[in-house]
Every structure is written in structure tokens, then in C-alpha cells.
Amino acid sequence: MILVSSCLGGIECRYNGSHAASEKIRKLVDEKKAVMACPELLGGFSTPREPAEIIGGTGEDVLNGTAKIVTASGEDVTELYMEGAAKTLAYAKEINASAVILKENSPSCGSGFIYNGTFSGKKITGSGVTAALLKQAGYRVISENELNDIL
């Protein structure tokens, strides 16, 4: 079973209330080859919500306590992101996920790129906190841009 970001499956759960649906991912879900999860909703956020970025590093740094996740207005939301990451990892274990496809650039789900923490639209190489936790646990984590690598 493949675990995918809910927004890639067409659920309107992104920070701005939109989705990022991929027809290939929707097909995987429809064929019962994939299931969806949104780490941010699992962490307790609602939709829409204020944008957030990792300040001071990447998801790996958030996990080791040297970076945090804050909203555009400055609220520290690190704990909610950590809770969502932990719940997503538990779900991946529960379904015995063979791979995980997450939404690129997200402070939760980015697997190769995230925003740089300045809310300027600039990106850096790195993972979001959920992607980092899943990678540390040994899961193969890719973005929607790498979908053909596993299909």
C-alpha cells in the first residue's frame, strides 16, 4: 500500500483551502493501491490555515530541536507539526506502507525542497518534518514530481 498526501488525492486540505490533485494519484486511491493522510490535519490544524515555514533549518533540524515551524504572523506551531508527523508515521506502520508520496515544498511533506523560512517564496533543499521522520524510519519518501519512479 502506498501512503499519499491527501491534497494530492484531491482533498481540499492545503493551508489555503485548495488541493493539488494528481490524476495518477487519484487513480491509485480509486484502485485501492494508495490511501491518503494529511499530516497537518492529523496534527490538529484546520483548513484554511495561516501559511507556515521552517525557521532555522529543515525537517531534520525540527526533529532534533534546532529549528522550529512558525506561521507568517510568528506563532510557533512546531508541536502541532510534530504531532502530525508522529501520527502519519503510525499510520504508515499500520498500513505497512511500501512507499510514501508527499506534496513537495510543504513544511510537513516536502521531500526534496521546502520554503526557506522567510515567507518570500524562496526554496531550499531539504525535507519537511513528516518527510524527515518517515525517512528516518526507513520509508521511501518521494514527491509528486517523482511519481513515475515508483509506478
Curated annotation (Swiss-Prot):
Report any Pfam family annotated for this entry. 2-thiour_desulf
Checking InterPro entries in the record gives: 2-thiour_desulf (IPR007553)
Superkingdom of this protein's organism: Bacteria
Protein name, UniProt field: Uncharacterized protein YbbK
Can you name the source organism? Bacillus subtilis (strain 168)
Q: Which gene encodes it?
A: ybbK
